[in-house]
Amino acid sequence: MTDARTRLSRFGSKLITFHPAPGANVNALIDVIPVIAALVLVSAIHGPRHGLIGMLGAMGGLSGKQSPPRTRLRILLGVGVVLMISQTIGISLSSFPVLLPAALGIWSFVMIFVWNALHLGPPGPLNVLFAAALASYYAAEGMTYADIMPATAASFLLAAATSMIVILVNPVRPARRAVSKAMEAVDLYANPEQDATPADLARLRSEAHNSVHAAWWILNDGVWPQDPRALGRPWMYRLWKRMSMAWEGLRADLLSAHITLTTTLHAQSFPSAEASDMRANVRYTPMGRPPWRYLLRTSLERGSRPLMVALRAATGVLVAAVAMEIVPFGRPYWAVLSVLIIVQMDFTRADMTVRAVLRVIGTSIGLQGYLAIMLVQPTPWMRIGIVAVALWTMNALIPRQYGIASIFITIFALIMLPISGEQQALTVAVARIEETVVGLVTAIGVIHVVGKRAPVLLVRSQYRRTLRSLMPVLRDLESGMSTTVTGMEHRNEMVHELIQASAVLSATRPDSPEILKNWSLVDRAVTEFGYDVLAHCWHLGDRPVRWARRISAEIALLLASLPPVSDQRVDPARVKSMVEEIHHQLPPMKAC
């Protein structure tokens, strides 16, 4: 009884918690400037009705907002294409309601899987997916391709262009922020507190590697590959030169931090070994994003995080859309939005449940606000102003308190609809409440039914993948190929998986604390092993060693001895001891 009260109290405190978010107001303003610019321009040219219809296109212009210019440009090009495909799906299938749930479910699976597999970053694929559901609603209300597609395309292009202009004012801002974070993390690891425990050092080491890896990811993705003078555009050359100088400075800072990280790792892994000159290996340091083929291939494995999130979201969308076709009220689009807002996030079950409850409360209050606004009978341009204010407010509040943000999300989403008259607004408000309940009941059901087996699957799959990633690195050591491009890619993939392993365990442990409580021992053993192998790579360079083949074979035997990935429990103490036994076979650095 006491445990139940404690859990209920903890749940209630999460509902009313107001999180500090320094800089959220400014970041929200930077984010919404492109959207508001597109909304105003399209409304001025084609009228407020078309401006509001194209809002999801403008929202798509926020994609890749934390990426450097080159990366963001690629993301925006891809989002623009899939946004048009998404709306085509919604419009085309609005006349075939039987096919709509399956189509929305499949499309949700594809988009969420690819987005998470490739780590495309915030704000996620929600706007692209909602575009399909909303387009089906617009088409059912009598709108045509000519009403919807041009407005969406124009809004997207204007918002994307404005967002690129905004980011080019300070093009290295994302990279500078990442490098600064990496340097701070490395400094904490290299100069720990005097009373730091081995567990503290392990945590600092993982955080430092995570930050350095992420910074190389952003930096290498953002570097322009060639001198654009060949294009004959002087302004582009000046921009490229300014960015290149800043980029080189950031690269030098990050390289220095990375060498400090590796030197510290070497000293901690092999304290009795003679120190190596890490600067001799600087050309092998840069890492970054693993190849997209690798990311997609590993994400297709049973129990991978992108696959689990995509399956959960697709199931929720399918069930909600089918339910809305069966019940005698409402339309699928709002229920689909309610599901996606909850289940497409990579949160714990408890956090997603809290988010669902906050969504119901926020939607209910937001509908009252929407009805109050409609009583005033706002003009089309007043609606544009309300949308702009609601958009900024919800973006500023989402990091702080999702329930309050949901009030403005609801107002924002409903003001966009082409509705006039108090009676029609009341009808829509009642329908939205019903659809929200259907969507969030579905979301909670999917979270606790489909996601119940997820923690064990995720953890077992990730640690198997992490151990397997050591094998190519060991084969490179055996053949003296560590300093080749292929060797660097294998090492990069190994570090990526080591980081993912700790992240997956941290994210899933709150959902299954009893089952996963001892997996931290496995995490410690695997990360110690992996980082010691990495230290050997730095020390040995291109010298071949025969012992690496034996270590790789031992890992293969370990993986073969484990049962296939499933929700079947595995004794973590046994896995830990097996990993440590292989780890102890690594020779001391002096014996290399």
Residue ranges and their predicted role:
Residues K65-L73, I89, F96, Q226-G232, ...:
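Hydrophobic alpha-helical segments that drive targeting, anchoring, or assembly
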Residues L15-N27, S43-H46, Q66-L76, S94-F96, ...:
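Short, amphipathic, aromatic/basic-enriched membrane-interface segments that mark the entry/exit
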Residues I45, L93, P97, L118-H119, ...:
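Membrane-interfacial segments
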Residues L56-G57, V79-L83, V317, A335-I342, ...:
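Alpha-helical transmembrane segments of multi-pass membrane proteins
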Residues D3-S13, A28-P69, L76-M84, P101-T144, ...:
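Pore- and pathway-forming membrane helices of multi-pass small-molecule/ion transporters and channels
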Residues L295-V389:
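Core alpha-helical transmembrane segments of integral membrane proteins
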Residues M1-I36, V40, M143-F156, A160-W334, ...:
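Cytosolic regulatory and coupling regions of membrane transport/channel systems
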Residues P97-V98, T144-Y145, P380-R383, F529:
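Membrane-helix interface segments
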